[in-house]
Amino acid sequence: MSRKTPIERYRNIGISAHIDAGKTTTTERILFYTGVNHKLGEVHDGAATMDWMEQEQERGITITSAATTAFWKGMAGNYPEHRINIIDTPGHVDFTIEVERSMRVLDGACMVYDAVGGVQPQSETVWRQANKYNVPRIAFVNKMDRVGADFFRVQTQIADRLKGRAVPIQIPVGAEDHFQGVVDLVKMKAVVWDDASQGVRFEYVDIPAELLPVAQEWRDKMIEAAAEADEALLEQYLAGEPLTETQIKQGLRKRTIANEIVPMLCGSAFKNKGVQSMLDAVIDYLPSPADVPAILGHTEDDREAERHPSDDEPFSALAFKIMTDPFVGQLIFFRVYSGVVNSGDTVYNPVKGKRERLGRILQMHANVRQEIKEVRAGDIAAAVGLKEATTGDTLCDPGKVIILERMSFPEPVISQAVEPKTKADQEKMGIALNRLAQEDPSFRVTTDEESGQTIISGMGELHLEILVDRMRREFGVEASVGKPQVAYRETIRQGVKDVEGKFIKQSGGRGQYGHVVLNLEPMPHGGGYEFVDAIKGGVVPREFIPAVDKGIRETLTAGVLAGYPVVDVKATLVFGSYHDVDSNENAFRMAGSMAFKEGMKRARPILLEPMMSVEVETPEEFTGNVMGDLSSRRGMVHGMEEIAGGGGKVVRAEVPLATMFGYSTSLRSLTQGRATFTMEFKHYAEAPANVAEAVINAKKA
């Protein structure tokens, strides 16, 4: 089967924005204008096509990136048909992982901004992720009909906060209630959309006289940006020769793809204005798979390899998302970088070292699926029947192996115990948690060896709340969630010598006799436990020495202060005695345990708490607040630097885990939601006396 759409006419784009910028409505309009969707879905009444999980419709926030394919021939029908694959991305900071993984497989992005709120917190996070993967982007300033809408303020914010060079290619005609349309600066005409046809029909009209000077000023800036694309255009521009419409678009396209400028448009998706010309801009300025560099990877013997976006190259693809579909089971979303693959073909997963048969291949339109026979370079599709693949795995031609660069996922920062409400839910909960962890690499499930509880860990409180909610809805598991917990440890601060342990029971018949003398000393951090046999002259027989070690090890599981595990201690067996008849392994095990407990009490036991390495990325104006707050959490700030490419500061600190619960919520309110943070375990450190006392008392209560 030959290719329906040439790869040059593909656009793989993401639509990214802050939580309320109207991104889902914008996507809905795209689906409507591209003729896929005949009834507009509104987020307000929970009917939007892209927000397909029940919870998303209830909360009105997009949680899962749904992938949709649409076709576009231009607002005026003047383009050959282009195929646009759209990945809708969530705007909430707890779902940053979703944005991250979609950025990895996109060729371009459309950043949606609220004309009133402007560059908001998640916009900054998304911008950083787009920078990380070198994704070219255009900007769409939405909600121009809202009170307080200001297109030019957003342009300034992109420059100041994001250090991006935003180049308006449109300016608004009016704003708030008087928003009527846009001025197309390339054509130097105003565009007015027809309300009766919900914006399908439009006309070019003359620019209102009062707007002409402003339009001319911004057009000059736009042409200058286009002319800087190459020597020939620049010479023509400097010689005072006007650039043609085609030359302007070529110049802007070249610079957008090189990530030097961000073309800026505006509109009101809700009022059916502007999305149509934004689609034209996707075609005019964002790259096709053929415009981006070949994807890099390595062979199984670690030599560098690459794949060009061509059907003639060996098949290579990246699995970027796993979803459980109520009808077909597990869906693996993948982006094809090179070659062709048919349903039924065998593909190789070099990360797992497994061959798998590709079952059905589905193309998704939100959650409506269409079965297709083959996919080619540049396509995004979902596969049924892959058992082994997980997010970030490569799928490739078994005869021409390449391993594409894996995605990097953040470590979870919050943990809670979770237990089923009934015995019947126990097994179902295990299955549900494993399935959810498979879908979401930033969600972990572990078992606490001390308490036996199941611990779930994720990117924030909302993240875990939604996963527990999904367990209930999708798997019918009712679970209760505990308060977040801290894993403390105990150790000793000083050495003690000649600590005795005697276990003697002699009351007729076979008795028990074990007697040991130990020296204890502290070990350096992370030293664990060490046992040394220093017995001379056989005062404790050889065969009983391992029993002493065993007795001490059993005691290490619960320290004398608050019953937490004991770490970093060295025990040396120096003396003891035995009885020919009554001594046995059990007696020496008990004697070892008793001596260790006694020794620990005398060796100034202390409580250790986990310290976390915390990095906060924040806009500059909130740096003081962030540092003050970390100090109030007993944190030690030990470094601060500019974020590369501008746009704020990185604050580095070491903070006790115990004080970090609820931090994502606090940080959000402290910085108007504009900061993000990462947190990972660093080491254990001595807890201050007042903290230790509170923990010990709580444990004894």
From Swiss-Prot:
It is found in: Cytoplasm. Keywords: Cytoplasm, Elongation factor, GTP-binding, Nucleotide-binding, Protein biosynthesis. GTP binds at residues 17-24, 88-92, 142-145. Its main location: cytoplasm. One of its GO terms (cellular component) is cytoplasm. GO terms for molecular function: GTP binding; GTPase activity; guanosine tetraphosphate binding; translation elongation factor activity. Residues 8-290 form the tr-type G domain. SMART domains: EFG_C, EFG_IV. It comes from the Bacteria. The keyword Endoplasmic reticulum does not apply. GO terms for biological process: ribosome disassembly. Catalyzes the GTP-dependent ribosomal translocation step during translation elongation. During this step, the ribosome changes from the pre-translocational (PRE) to the post-translocational (POST) state as the newly formed A-site-bound peptidyl-tRNA and P-site-bound deacylated tRNA move to the P and E sites, respectively. Catalyzes the coordinated movement of the two tRNA molecules, the mRNA and conformational changes in the ribosome. NCBIfam families: EF-G, PRK12740.1-3, PRK12740.1-5, small_GTP. Belongs to the TRAFAC class translation factor GTPase superfamily. Classic translation factor GTPase family. EF-G/EF-2 subfamily. PANTHER family: RIBOSOME-RELEASING FACTOR 2, MITOCHONDRIAL, TRANSLATION ELONGATION FACTOR G-RELATED. This is Elongation factor G 2. It comes from Cupriavidus pinatubonensis (strain JMP 134 / LMG 1197) (Cupriavidus necator (strain JMP 134)). The gene is fusA2.
